[in-house]
Swiss-Prot record:
It is found in: Cytoplasm. It catalyses: [protein]-peptidylproline (omega=180) = [protein]-peptidylproline (omega=0). GO terms for molecular function: peptidyl-prolyl cis-trans isomerase activity; protein folding chaperone; ribosome binding. The keyword Cell division applies. This is Trigger factor. The lineage of its organism: Bacteria, Bacillati, Bacillota, Bacilli, Bacillales. One of its GO terms (biological process) is 'de novo' cotranslational protein folding. It comes from the Bacteria. Consists of 3 domains; the N-terminus binds the ribosome, the middle domain has PPIase activity, while the C-terminus has intrinsic chaperone activity on its own. Involved in protein export. Acts as a chaperone by maintaining the newly synthesized protein in an open conformation. Functions as a peptidyl-prolyl cis-trans isomerase. Keywords: Cell cycle, Cell division, Chaperone, Cytoplasm, Isomerase, Rotamase. Its EC number is 5.2.1.8.
Length: 434
């Protein structure tokens, strides 16, 4: 087999592949054995038609496509390796010639990974957010804990106020007719949560337990149920109970209830301060890294192929779908409720997808420029970290990752991390207030 690469445009070229005649003949033999099992010829059982008779009746050309399907995957992979190109999309295949006792000649139009001309990636200035934790930060975190451990207590007397939870029955009507999903009993609604149609919750403020009211609202124009969008509606509402948050006292008992490691409120505050310091440190490091990545990518000259942007957009859409599944939802349901289409979402993702691709290409170029190497020991350490994180054996982790590139992917990720380290270690830090 021989292969030749000719660049025709910046990120595109033609890969000419020639496969020897003897391999073509072997592939034609395999193709015949496959096809003859499906052929009906009077006087012969399926699979028993002689080769000569088959070719006379159907022509050897009838075997060409199957022979190409047999030869091309391996030939293309070998040609890519031999020429050292890096395809980023499926090739467009044009079969120049194939025949019995003749070589297979194929021209594949291929989009390849673009060249990257790095700008100045060392000495980049970066603002470092402050990691200081103030007393106000600790008090705010303590207040959150207090809110999280609040109890809802039924009011014996009083009116609904913002922040209360109202237990209600409601029945909705549009044009005097009830509609699907517009009725519920003993529904707990937090006033001010904005979880209902705009204007609904506000009209419950001031009502007492046992009172009833007709709530007049208008469905938003972009409402997911098209038959209701933009229409006025009346909801008949009855209030059963009003529940109000009762905050626990901030004392030593509260501290012990929320954190078994502490005995006093002061100890809890110290724990909160330590946690906040760690969070701010991580956030600061991430902000520095992201800023440097953005600057390095902006200074690099890269003509990103559309195919790479589309692939990254696909990945982002898949990631979003996985996050929805974790919440008991899927993309189809999301599109129905949000009124968006897949095309809308792809368009939203496209700009970020291109940025992601540019950043990764820049990091790969930095790793190459800095001769970054990853040892087998480092790869094994990474597998061990994954095994510890997911509580699986290293062998299980390797088996799970095998279908996704396995060791090569892990090695690639480690190289990118080291390239990020190069950026950070060679940057000029400018400390700012948070």
């Amino acid at each position: 087999m021989s292969a030749k690469w000719e660049k025709t445009e910046e990120n595109t070229g033609v890969l000419t592949i020639e496969v020897e005649a003897d391999k073509v003949n072997d592939a034609l033999d395999k193709a015949f054995k496959k096809v003859v099992k499906k052929v009906n010829v009077p006087g012969f059982r399926k699979g028993k038609v002689p080769r000569g008779l088959f070719e006379k009746q159907f022509g050897v050309e009838s075997l060409y496509q199957d022979a190409i399907d047999i030869l091309l995957p391996e030939a293309y992979a070998n040609a890519v390796e031999e020429t050292g190109i890096y395809p980023v999309d499926r090739p467009e295949i044009d079969v120049e010639s194939i025949g019995k006792n003749e070589p297979l000649i194929v021209k594949a139009t291929v989009t390849v990974k673009p060249e990257v001309k790095l700008g100045d990636y060392k000495g980049l200035e970066v603002e470092v957010p402050s990691t200081d934790v103030t007393d106000e930060d600790v008090e705010a975190e303590l207040k959150k804990l207090q809110e999280q451990h609040a109890e809802l207590v039924v009011l014996e007397e009083g009116e609904i106020a913002n922040g209360d939870t109202a237990v209600i029955d409601f029945a909705g009507y549009v044009d005097g007719e009830a509609f699907e999903g517009g009725t519920a009993e003993n529904y707990s609604l937090e006033i001010g949560s904005n979880s209902f149609i705009p204007g609904f919750e506000e009209q419950l403020v001031g009502l007492k337990s046992g009172e009833e009211k007709d709530v007049e609202v208008t469905f938003p124009e972009e409402y997911h149920a098209e038959e209701l969008a933009g229409k006025p509606a009346t909801f008949k509402v009855k209030v059963h109970d009003i529940k109000r948050k009762e905050l626990p006292e901030l004392d030593d008992e509260f501290a012990k209830d929320v954190n078994e490691k502490v005995e006093t409120l002061d100890e809890l505050k110290n724990e909160l301060r330590s946690t906040l310091e760690e969070q701010k440190k991580t956030a600061s490091e991430n902000a520095v890294r992201d800023s440097l990545l953005e600057k390095a990518a902006e200074q690099a000259e890269i003509n990103v192929p559309e195919a790479m942007i589309e692939t990254e957009t696909d990945r982002m859409l898949q990631e979003f779908g996985q996050r929805l599944q974790a919440q008991g939802m899927n993309l189809d349901m999301y599109f129905q409720f949000s009124g968006q289409t897949e095309e809308d979402m792809r368009n939203q993702f496209k700009e970020d997808a291109e940025k992601r691709v540019r950043v990764n290409l820049t990091l790969e170029a930095i790793a190459e420029a800095e001769n970054v190497e990853v040892s087998e020991e480092e790869i094994e350490e990474e597998f061990q970290k994954m095994a510890d994180m997911y509580q699986r054996s290293v062998e299980e982790i390797k088996a799970l990752l095998a279908a996704q590139g396995g060791t090569d992917n892990v090695k690639g990720d480690l190289k990118l991390r080291k390239a990020i380290d190069v950026l950070v270690e060679n940057s000029k830090e400018v400390t700012t207030e948070s």
